[in-house]
Amino acid sequence: MEKIAIITDTTADLTEEFIKENDINVLSFRIIYKDKEYKDKVDITSEEVYRNFEIEVPKSSMPSLQDMEDLYKKLEEEGYTHAIGITLSSGLSGIFNGLKMIADEHSKIKSFIYDSKLISLGEGALVEECSKMIHNNKSFDEIVKAIPEIRKKIHLFFVVGTLDYLKKGGRIGKIAGTIGKLLNIKPIVSVDDNGVYYAYDKVRGRKQSLNRVMEIAKDITKNSKCRAYVMHGDAEKESKEFFKKVKELPNINNAFYNGCISPVSGVHSGPGLVGLVLLEE
């Protein structure tokens, strides 16, 4: 009898309720200030990160290898035979390589560690689908086979208030050099096949950038029924207005407002993020 564990990280932006109900194992990123280090979503909130920006923009690091080692020991003690890990994009972090290395050292548990090439609820949607398959008594091999196919159906787009934070954190990817700050050009950011940020499109002005994301969503939902997720980074009012419009799109089966992104994601994106994830169903 297979006993399958799911492992992910705090950037997947899953709700606490979902994590508890589905026994999801979540590895915490680290947020590092000059005088103190915090565990993402454990002892620091997104709001605290944003409010402190004027004083200090912190650095971040991936979950420690020791945290991963401790998790695998716990899973072994709890009698898990298999583990599926869904991680933040390897184009943005070393967590995929780290978790794969630790998984390979624990041969008692058969593991499949998957590089989502996504962030936030793009990654989170994959975790949710894996959890559903476990509840539907799918085998480990069936789930492993399904994951890359589900990944192909996930679309992620977001806009940010300023690119300065992505630059500071070294997460600017392929967006650099394409944006004219003085012209108020706003990129619609997505991730490419390597899981690196790039400018999917560029428009002038904040309002137009959100309208453009809506147009992109209309194109995707025109021919496919989709599940939608909306999230924000210190842009609650705008994101709620955006969510109302998303719910009215044709072919939206379910729409979820997941609130604020993880503190560590906020460190790199800065205030003003509004994001949309679509999963073709």
Swiss-Prot record:
Highest rank taxon of the organism: Bacteria
InterPro entries: DegV, DegV_C, DegV_domain_contain
Disulphide bridges, residue numbers: none
Binding site for hexadecanoate: S60, S93
Gene3D superfamilies referenced in this protein's UniProt entry, alphabetically: 3.30.1180.10, 3.40.50.10170
Keywords from the UniProt entry: Lipid-binding
GO terms for MF: lipid binding
Domain DegV span(s) in chain numbering: 4-280
Protein function: May bind long-chain fatty acids, such as palmitate, and may play a role in lipid transport or fatty acid metabolism.
UniProt name for this protein: DegV domain-containing protein CA_C0948
Lineage of origin: Bacteria, Bacillati, Bacillota, Clostridia, Eubacteriales
